[in-house]
From Swiss-Prot:
Subcellular localization: Cytoplasm, Nucleoid
Principal subcellular localization: cytoplasm
PROSITE patterns reported for this sequence: SPOVT_ABRB
Family: Belongs to the MraZ family.
Name of the protein in its database record: Transcriptional regulator MraZ
Annotated GO CC locations: cytoplasm; nucleoid
GO molecular function, one term: DNA-binding transcription factor activity
Biological processes per GO annotation: negative regulation of DNA-templated transcription initiation
Protein encoded by which gene: mraZ
Record's keyword terms, sorted: Cytoplasm, DNA-binding, Repeat, Transcription, Transcription regulation
Length: 143
């Protein structure tokens, strides 16, 4: 399970070190894709395969379903670590997520997200202000 919040730095060659706890769970190859709230989502191949199945079941007659499927699939790439446990974040993903120097890597259960520190700070401030309402909206899920 991926959990926790880690601050890291993107170097001048667009390399990002991934926490060792996360690397151990990913395996040799994994997927990174564009995700919601201007973040990137990284996941083991098994999680990606499940997500692909879910995307393939979206109703192609609905414009939003086609858009979401295209966005996630077109934004995806297979990634692997270098010897120092880093990944290279390609320009298109770096630009989408506004990744510059300061980056936050956050565990979200079956995967983890990569955020610009600025976007993460804004997101967590907004979410913290509304956390009680968010939790109440999820009462049916027995959390």
């Amino acid at each position: 399970m991926f959990m926790g919040e880690y601050s890291h730095t993107l170097d001048t060659k667009s390399r990002l070190i991934i926490p060792a706890k996360f690397r151990n769970q990913l395996g040799d190859q994994f997927i990174i894709t564009k995700w919601m709230e201007k973040s990137l989502r990284a996941m083991p191949m098994a999680v990606w395969e499940k997500l692909q199945e879910q995307l393939n079941q979206l109703p192609l007659g609905k414009k939003d379903a086609r858009a979401f499927r295209r966005f996630v699939m077109a934004g995806a790439l297979e990634a692997e670590f270098d010897k120092q446990g880093r990944i290279v974040v390609p320009n298109n993903l770096r630009e989408y997520a506004s990744l510059e120097k300061s980056v936050v890597v956050t565990g979200v259960g079956d995967s983890f997200e990569i955020w610009s520190a600025e976007n993460w700070s804004a997101y967590t401030a907004e979410t913290a202000d509304d956390f009680d309402n968010i939790a109440e909206g999820l009462v049916d899920f027995d959390l």
